[in-house]
Amino acid sequence: MHKLIIHGGTPLKGSINISGAKNAVLPIMAASILTDKLHITNVPKLTDVSTMKDLLRSHGADIEIIKHQDEFELIIDTKNINNFTADYEIVRKMRASIWVLGPLLTKYGKAKVSLPGGCAIGARQVDLHIAVLKAMGAEIEIEDGYINASSKGRLKGTHFVFDKVSVGATINAILVAVLAEGETVLFNCGREPEIVDLCNCLITMGADIAGIGTSEITIKGKDSLNKASYKVLSDRIEAGTYMFAAAITKGDVKICGIDYHIVENIALKLIETGIKVVPINNGVQVTYEGKLNSVDLETNPYPGFATDLQAQFMSLMTLSSGVSMITENIFENRFMHVPELCRMGADIVVRGNKAVVRGVEMLKGAEVMASDLRASVSLILAGLSTNSKTVLHRIYHLDRGFQDLEKKLSNCGADIKRV
């Protein structure tokens, strides 16, 4: 099994190009089921993307892959979909597999999808997915670990209020409603840029969607959708991760290929800590200027601070000049990186959904283990900040969500290699 060897102590300097967004491309790939052909560009090279390709192929899709140096293009032909079951062996690898449920059901009237896996950070129940589908007329049973869904004729538009904000359920509801009969109005929706990107792709395919980027989305169902070509937006979580990497190594890095407005809340939080952050053409520049203040943080649905960046921010706060309180409001089990950071000398105490971080002068290299995707990269950031050697195990988590991470960091001076 591979591991990463990190020799820290070098400030990162240079530029990093941001890849396509994992959390946008996966639902867009699922949306290909709604039409006959979808051409997607700026596709990142990630294992989760490979898993979604395998899943779509298992349903009968034909996928052409055009490889470029830094990205893929995918041409997904779904006119011969002939299998409506998403098997456990594929679905267990990735929770995003649940997003084929809506498209299969709304277009073909039936779907059987294994209850998803792929993540250790919380229960992330599918109750809201099921509730909105039932509200649109679907008949659903859960048997032997599978969601069995069917409909008699087209699903019907409805008015539906999500009990709590759910990115995943918002996506599935949108994917269903674009082919449902009549008008659907969804309340308390997720507002994430990746949801906006999915909606923009669906509009390119001929969907009628209003209220994009707000908590109230109105969709008028169409009889069918068109072939289309679409470029996926850049990954704000990857961008934020490298912004924190620049800060924790006392570096100066240009983050390129990202719209400033979708990382502005990250930039503002960094500015609070004393880091200089300025917009540049097609990106943002992050510069350490000699101080790192402790700052409190709460994760919340967008436009709040992303839970997917909480672990990286915590790594930064371990070296701050005071005490910070980090509150995790999205997932109940997202402090699994804390024991590993403490192995490196961090002073962190967890109380429920809150972590109290007392800054220390320096972290120390150690052998540590990744527990999930975002926790793994937080340990890399911690390792880069030390003046010693860190060994990170179970790095297969990284490949689910970060393309060419070692290469991008090495190009900015980091001593990091996979063995």
UniProtKB/Swiss-Prot annotation:
UniProt-annotated binding residues for phosphoenolpyruvate: K22, N23
Main location: cytoplasm
An MF annotation (GO) of this entry: UDP-N-acetylglucosamine 1-carboxyvinyltransferase activity
Swiss-Prot/TrEMBL keywords: Cell cycle, Cell division, Cell shape, Cell wall biogenesis/degradation, Cytoplasm, Peptidoglycan synthesis, Pyruvate, Transferase
Catalytic machinery residues: C119
Any single Gene Ontology cellular-component annotation: cytoplasm
Location within or outside the cell: Cytoplasm
Record bears the keyword Chloroplast: no
Taxonomic superkingdom: Bacteria
EC class: transferase
GO biological process: cell division; cell wall organization; peptidoglycan biosynthetic process; regulation of cell shape; UDP-N-acetylgalactosamine biosynthetic process
Sections of the chain in a coiled coil: none
Family: Belongs to the EPSP synthase family. MurA subfamily.
Function, in words: Cell wall formation. Adds enolpyruvyl to UDP-N-acetylglucosamine.
Protein name: UDP-N-acetylglucosamine 1-carboxyvinyltransferase
Species this chain originates from: Rickettsia rickettsii (strain Sheila Smith)
